[in-house]
Design a protein with these regions (language model features):
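Charge-rich, acidic-biased intrinsically disordered regions
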Residues: 11-12, 124, 253-275, 364-398, ...
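Extended, helix-rich architectural segments
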Residues: 1-134, 139, 450, 461-465, ...
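Long, highly charged low-complexity segments enriched in Glu/Asp and Lys/Arg with interspersed Ser/Thr
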Residues: 424-457
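Membrane-proximal bilayer-interacting regions
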Residues: 403-410, 414-431, 437
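Intrinsically disordered or highly flexible coil/loop and linker segments, enriched in small
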Residues: 117, 233, 237-248, 316-327, ...
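Extended, regular secondary-structure scaffolds
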Residues: 113, 118-225
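Extended, charged amphipathic alpha-helical segments
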Residues: 191-341, 388
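Surface-exposed loop-to-helix/strand elements on domain peripheries
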Residues: 80-84, 282-400, 436-438
Length: 484
């Protein structure tokens, strides 16, 4: 039997397969990241731009526009158990401790830019507080089980100083390895950590998966990449033309050679001739002045119109309003409703993505609950755990208030409903505080009413004691209808 410091044969086979798969996918992932970060340098075709000017780089941030506006709309709110209207306290504590919203934002950014993101749920120093972290797809390779829609094995490789570390996660065990970075050296097994989970505690967030490509696809599509390349080359042509043709060219006809000679007999430079000599040319011996012709300077709109054409194509591909690309200042919406209509398709995409990512986040919550309760089953109702997202549409407080007020007036919804406060844009913490304030305010109102009743007790006839001066002879007052 092999010692625990040596990889078993089946473990080594899995490790080598995943390591090869990661290396094979790394180039495509790095290219997608370069488009997202605006670091991709477009290849010069060397048709109109000489090789000596290839050092001029033109960069467009349109790749980032395929990612960031969509991540901004994916705002996680809370987990709720089936039948409950409030967030679960246990899961809320775990998520707050781990900064889950920040980790989820990074995983979603990876999913949109690289096609997939990963969230790992592990253990830390506190056995009842799981660790939830986002892992980069460029460091991760996965063997996926299509039937169970879950990973069989997951390998994560990362650098630590001069050495390279690797973590191989398998059902019931986690293997930690290291490599000294020397060519030809072997991977060393540092630790073998058994656990009680019969699954790999890694969740994949795949953007726009297909039945034949479940690993997801980048939101920076091939069509968008072609548009970015064409627009970048056009901008490069604009840069070169600005340097060569922005100064109007001039032609001098009938000038004498002496017009280009300095008083000391040396020749004037081309720059001196352009700036000075042509302004003070003398007549020749026949009294004729040299004829100066100025060529028409280049028009930059030749290039900017092409860039605008590419921008219009990118706008359609991205489902973004044209002004998002910084080209159409006249494209600003005239009203809030107009802005909502312009971004409607992007909002519908966000709704679809929420439906896609909800089962994945439910798996994250299940893993967190299992690790926080070692040896125990999931709580009742956890299988139907709900994931609450904030609405992706642009929020208009005035419009929302008007709509809710009309619904409350029609008694379609109760005014103190938590749903009403959520539609008005209040966060869970704010809604809880408002509920506490409402209870305190109602208590104050009841106390104030009780104090008023104590100070002014009502008699059986409906008047205050000692205050009914018209109660009749028995009350010491005047009878009804009597004169004063």
């Amino acid at each position: 039997m092999l010692p625990d410091t040596v990889l078993h044969e089946d473990e080594r086979e899995v490790f080598e397969r995943l390591r090869t798969a990661r290396e094979d996918s790394l180039a495509d992932l790095q290219l997608s990241e370069a488009y997202y970060l605006g670091e991709y340098v477009v290849r010069n075709l060397r048709i109109s731009i000489p090789e000596s000017l290839e050092f001029i780089n033109t960069v467009l941030g349109w790749g980032g526009l395929a990612v960031d506006p969509r991540v901004e709309r994916m705002r996680f709110e809370s987990f709720r158990f089936a039948g409950q209207t409030e967030a679960d306290d246990t899961l809320a504590s775990i998520m707050d401790t781990n900064g889950f919203e920040a980790e989820l934002s990074m995983a979603l950014t990876d999913a949109y830019s690289l096609g997939r993101g990963y969230i790992t749920v592990g253990t830390g120093d506190d056995p009842e507080m799981p660790l939830i972290t986002a892992d980069s797809p460029m460091n991760t390779a996965v063997e996926w089980d299509v039937r169970t829609r879950s990973p069989r094995h997951v390998l994560t490789v990362y650098s630590e100083g001069k050495s390279t570390k690797a973590v191989l996660q398998m059902p019931r065990k986690t293997l930690r390895m290291s490599h000294d970075g020397q060519d030809g050296s072997e991977w060393h097994l540092d630790a073998r950590e058994p656990h009680d989970l019969d699954v790999v505690p890694v969740v994949r967030l795949a953007h726009a998966p297909l039945s034949g490509a479940r690993q997801g696809r980048s939101a920076i599509t091939p069509a968008l990449r072609a548009i970015i390349q064409g627009a970048s080359r056009t901008l490069l042509g604009l840069e070169v033309a600005r340097e060569f043709y922005s100064v109007p060219q001039k032609a001098i006809l009938g000038a004498a050679e002496s017009d280009f000679i300095n008083p000391d007999g040396s020749r004037k430079t081309a720059w001196e001739v352009y700036l000075h000599a042509v302004l003070a040319l003398e007549r020749d011996e026949d009294g004729n002045l040299p004829d100066i012709k100025q060529m028409q300077a280049y028009d930059p709109s030749v290039y900017t119109k092409v860039v605008e054409m590419y921008g219009a194509q990118a706008s359609g591909e991205l489902a973004l309003p044209p002004q998002y690309l910084g080209l159409y200042t006249e494209g600003n919406p005239v009203s809030a409703e107009g802005g909502q209509v312009a971004e409607g398709r992007l909002d519908r995409r966000a709704r679809l993505d929420m439906a896609r990512f909800t089962p994945d986040l439910r798996k994250v919550a299940h893993l967190a609950l299992r690790l926080s309760r070692p040896g125990l089953d999931l709580p009742t109702g956890a299988e139907r755990l709900s994931v609450d997202w904030l609405a992706p549409e642009m929020f208009n407080a005035s419009q929302a208030s008007d709509s809710i007020s009309k619904q409350v007036a029609a008694e379609a919804v109760p005014p103190n409903s938590d749903v009403v406060l959520k539609r008005l844009g209040y966060s869970p913490v704010e809604r809880l505080r408002l509920e506490q304030d409402r209870v305190a305010w109602q208590g104050e109102q009841m106390l104030r009413a009780a104090m008023t009743a104590t100070q002014n007790p009502q008699n059986p006839n409906g008047g205050s004691d000692g205050s009914n001066r018209d109660a009749g002879p028995d009350g010491g007052g005047k009878p009804d209808g009597g004169d004063a």
